[in-house]
């Protein structure tokens, strides 16, 4: 006899064969063995299946006799048939008392017990009473394969898969009953549910020996087993599929699902078309929803629409799963009208529908609509909470995501790894050091901090929350058995964000040599961003060449990163070339090229590109409109009326509500063209309290136009607000310093330090001979420090001769005039430009310098004089864009 190894499983639970009297169900007289069929029919027809009703119908019950004649035997059979009917009704109405009543009469039977016992087992398990089912089972003198199968399948339905396995092994050990096809289907289902795939494979061998492989139900269950097994592939499923002599729709669906899971959507569609050619087979809702989920790129867009048409033709548009899949499909292809139309036409919705709608609205940036859908969900679960929280993170609403996470904790909603990952991501968006430490501690306390996904998210969070030391410690202690590629990518991005791009490049080279970094679209995109931040064009070009050779250039996000990289490296020609050679563009592609023109302060070209965008009917996003409004600062002529029209019509034309970023950009445009009063009125008419960034935009414009009256009012507003970010603390401190309130300035700095914030020091750097030479104010760490300082002294003297006058108003320290000049003369940008002049004698080649913050007014004036003294073009990029200093003039026209 062929058996299966079961030494690893627990023994079957012991139930005594003889049931103690106190455990026996109470015998009701209503269910006596001698009930006439018409009486049972009247009983079963009653909608109230309570024992009291049964008792009322049984007043004429008679006792059993020792012998039966033919008529009495027929009566017993009729009564047993009535029991079956009662069991069906009790299962339908979930009335366990009737089942127990049948059970009581069952115990009095001397014959015909097995068939009724099997029905009792099934009914008890359907009602969720496994112990009572076992009591019936052990009372059977000769359980059949149906008895065992009823227990196995019932236990599986009740998530008692281990108990189901025990029953199967008891059956095999007894050796009196052989499993049938339904037994194999039930036990394979249990194996899949508890991930006992190796056991399932052993059972596969038993199925082959038992000759049940020709059963379509058994073969379908085997395909499902191999489909769910991570150690198997779709080839194993296909092999089984090819061996099935007769297939049903479930067979086709299983193999299609397996191909979709492995990303072989084209092969799945080929099988789908083959399925349609087989006579007698029609697709069902599972087929369509599975194939729709595989439509993730533009190459299968038409196929997805074809599936939609097929669903309409064959009448599957009322199926929930099909509608849910269609909503997911159209949201991937940015067709919100279709999504909303499908949702409105649905007769019913479920949790999946709401989750798909929340995800769709969030992907379109329609946060309020997503929140409204969530609010209308009556039975919220972990999945709906996770969808909303992930959507908040995707749209940059870290604080809202954290509040939702807190709500989940208070309501006792079950947390998953995805929930915690989103909460950690939200901390990174908020950039609150203390909050990040609390979430980090929460993950450690509940033992999830070492989950690979959460661990990577925690490292990334540390890089965003002023905790680079913690991030470096986590990276150094990264488990050797885990892939470190994502962690490496995160910490490289962290270095770039925290003003340490040189460290990012150094780590990139080291991990690349140690083969700890896998170069894919994500890592290449990140390192291109670092190259752009550094202005390291040569390295960016090498990455570009590698991407071409590796076949990554078709990736849109990589193309967008290349545009951005070349733009930040002052190479707009190559940025335009990349844009023109891309096979397809998304809104980010257009945004990247518009941003390129703005960095060069070329507003007219940016607006021309915006016109092309409108001609192609490409829908802008929030960032697009921010960039386009900003472009009006850099036009050759005043185009304020067009800018004003665009700003005021954002909601009506593009369905985008103006945000703080749009107000900030518009105020800068008004300030640039000298309309300070209108800018102030715009701020005062904002529907919400203006944020510091908007007020700062107006304050900068007041500096440019020397308008002290408006500046005082704006400064007063800024000082009345509570700072929330490091930049807001620094601005408030600087305002106090500029006004001579040194003590108040220091108090603000102290409060900033208490919150764990620190100011990123001003830093300038230059790329020379493929090396990054970095400087901060009064830096003496460079190997050529003496030559640099000597050269700078000479440059200062020469500039003083031709009219340069140091402007000590830009020194915000409480020191004497002599020290203020000393501070001014040794700013990081001056040191970097001096090194650039000394290290390059090529007169026709510009000196290229990068600075991480806005260039101060004194340095700006100084570089105009240097361009005259040394007869060299100086190209400097700061946070506002590029400055081209040529012959004593700057491309920004002193308006930056």
From Swiss-Prot:
Region spans: Type DYW motif: 801-896
Name this protein carries in UniProt: Pentatricopeptide repeat-containing protein At5g03800
Coiled coil: none
Keywords: Repeat
Type E(+) motif: annotated segments: 770-800
Stated role: May play a role in embryogenesis.
Species annotation: Arabidopsis thaliana (Mouse-ear cress)
Phylogenetic lineage: Eukaryota, Viridiplantae, Streptophyta, Embryophyta, Tracheophyta
Family: Belongs to the PPR family. PCMP-H subfamily.
Gene Ontology MF terms: RNA binding; zinc ion binding
An individual GO BP term: embryo development ending in seed dormancy
Region (Type E motif): 694-769
Residue ranges of PPR repeats: 113-143, 144-178, 180-214, 215-247, 248-278, 284-318, 319-349, 350-380, 381-415, 416-450, 451-481, 484-519, 520-554, 555-585, 586-620, 621-653, 659-689
Keyword Repeat included in the entry's annotation: yes
Top-rank taxon, per record: Eukaryota
